[in-house]
Amino acid sequence: DVDFNTWQHDNVRATHQPGSTFKLFVYATAMKQGWLPSDARLKDDYIQMNVVDENGKPSVWRPHNANGRFSGANIPLRAAFAQSINTIAVKLGQEVGIPNVIKTAQDMGIKSKLNDAPSLPLGASDVHLMELVGAYASVANYGEYVKPTMITRIVDREGKVVYEARKEVRTVLSDKEAFYMQTLLGAGMTDAGGTSQALASQNYIGQWFWNRRIDAGGKTGTSNSHADAWFVGVTPNLVGGAWVGGEYRQIHFRSGALGQGSKTALPIFGLFMKKVLSDASLAPKYLARYRIPEGVNPADLEGRFVYQSADTTRHDSSSVDLSEGIGEAPREEHGDNTPPPPAAAPHEPTAPKEPVNNTLNGTAEPVKDQSPKTGMNKNSATIKTDRTQSSGEKKPKKKTSGDDLFN
């Protein structure tokens, strides 16, 4: 047991680098600006940006993908999100505007300080688990953010209510925008290369998911130097998140594979959901499908591309030590992986002619395919997304089936 008088670290509310779980806010901002899951305007190629660190030292940032390669193809947003392709997330952040990404994240419940930096889409600013899960719950709630509540009310021995939590509800996405994000989260489970595919296995919720008894999705995240592993899972009536890591940034997993959200954090949510859905008293409440808002064109939800399956690159989400060589993947993991020169061979496109000037807070981290073993902290948070539970009024939902759009 830990003595609270000497150790008061709250792992649920302690801030950590969220890795690729932060991409939710980049893509949600894009949906708000009229982008669609099927949009393939952005190319997965070599990019570099002129940046300055917190001390004002100029440098060049070269974000990498997990496999150290670039496909050279225009990637649909659905595939880019499902496969957690970093180059697309960084470019999308520049397209929609980092200040707008920050505004979306704040509207969706992120109160931690977010830095206006090109690396923010990769999770450069620390957040805590509870606010992240609360933000993801607004996607399941069709765009309505409901502030997470630990204690809803207190009743004394006579049955008198002595305390009742104030309900905080606000609309942050339209029905259609939220549905697009539900689709992107689900693609991580169903599409080739999706980083959340394991959740759909029989080890977790596969028996219900593939029988179309529940819709589900999620996003993995892995931070700088494999210090933090994340997974946030979303279902229509229950959202949960797991973080695995150490109390201090100096504590990290022995390898990138051990620190991957898909290997270390996803199983926590998966086993939790399996227990819930296996319970005869709980299953009727949480076995649910999404409704399809009016005006959704099924073609707008498509956009598959077979590319990669890892969810992280060398410095996926944190402040970097410029002395380490920004954005260069370790040679022992991917061979000679120095960024390609401007005159690149086919499938290794050239760098942009005019690098973007901005402030640097991070890049990304490659991974090794190893089985996870860790003795680090494992923390999780869950939020019921049923509006009846949180706000006293249930948002009307049409009973349209999602069979043709999800599984």
Predicted regions mapped to residue ranges:
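Extracytoplasmic/periplasmic beta-strand context in beta-sandwich domains
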Residues: D39-A40, D45, P118-L120, T149-T152
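Conserved catalytic neighborhood of penicillin-recognizing serine enzymes
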Residues: L36-V101, Y145, R157-G186
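Extracellular glycan-interaction surfaces
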Residues: A28
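Periplasmic/cell-envelope proteins involved in peptidoglycan metabolism and beta-lactam response
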Residues: D1-H16, S20-L24, P37-A40, P99-A105, ...
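Low-complexity, Gly/Ser/Thr/Pro-rich intrinsically disordered linker/tail segments
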Residues: G295-N407
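Mid-domain, small-residue-enriched loop/turn segments at the edges of structured enzyme/sensor domains
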Residues: N55-N65, V96-G134, M150
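A penicillin-recognizing enzyme superfamily signal
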Residues: D1-Q17, F22, L36, A79, ...
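Proteins synthesized as precursors that undergo proteolytic processing into mature forms
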Residues: V2-N5, M31, G109-L114
